[in-house]
């Protein structure tokens, strides 16, 4: 887990780290560009501490945002959704991947950021589906932020392999015959 956190921002594993993070800086720059165009963005991370770093930065810049993690009450959750959906000044919705996986309809968003890849591609798809709902009138753009030469690239390859295995399983007449024991274990791991 520490390798995944370090790929996002070294400060996630070393609070005393006082230098820049290329990935974090890229996320901030991309947010500034998109928000300047009056777009709305869902920002997902599997690390609440990562969202907290982003939250601290946004508070210092005055960019309007909503925030949702698993620690929020149902009422806070509903208020955050309402604020993002209805207030033009609320440009971003920071959401922990697990908290945002179920029961959210966020059609005001036209951009989705995945700040860190998750081992299970289905979890990411659930997050992306928050913006792809009935009532969505905008085209939705997805940005996946992946740090080069890190564990994130390996996770991305694993996700692709799992998607391929799932596709084989779904489209084959008798999918179990075409999968080796190793592939079955990978699919359900």
Regions found by a protein language model. Give the residues of each.
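SF2 helicase/translocase ATPase core recognition
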Residues: 76, 91-179
């Amino acid at each position: 887990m520490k390798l995944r956190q370090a790929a996002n921002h070294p400060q996630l594993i070393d609070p005393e780290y006082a230098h820049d993070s290329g990935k974090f800086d890229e996320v901030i720059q991309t947010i500034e560009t998109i928000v300047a165009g009056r777009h709305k963005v869902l920002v997902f991370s599997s690390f609440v501490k990562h969202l907290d770093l982003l939250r601290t930065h946004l508070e210092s810049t005055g960019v309007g945002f909503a925030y949702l993690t698993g620690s929020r009450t149902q009422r806070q959750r509903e208020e955050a959704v309402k604020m993002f959906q209805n207030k033009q000044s609320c440009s971003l919705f920071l959401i922990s991947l697990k908290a945002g996986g179920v029961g959210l309809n966020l059609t005001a968003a036209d951009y989705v950021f995945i700040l860190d890849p998750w081992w299970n591609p289905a979890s990411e798809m659930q997050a992306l589906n928050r913006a792809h709902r009935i009532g969505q009138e905008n085209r939705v753009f997805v940005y996946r932020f992946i740090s080069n030469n890190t564990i994130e690239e390996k996770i991305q390859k694993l996700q692709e392999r799992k998607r391929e295995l799932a596709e084989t399983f779904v489209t084959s007449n008798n999918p179990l015959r075409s999968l080796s024991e190793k592939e079955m274990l990978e699919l359900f791991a």
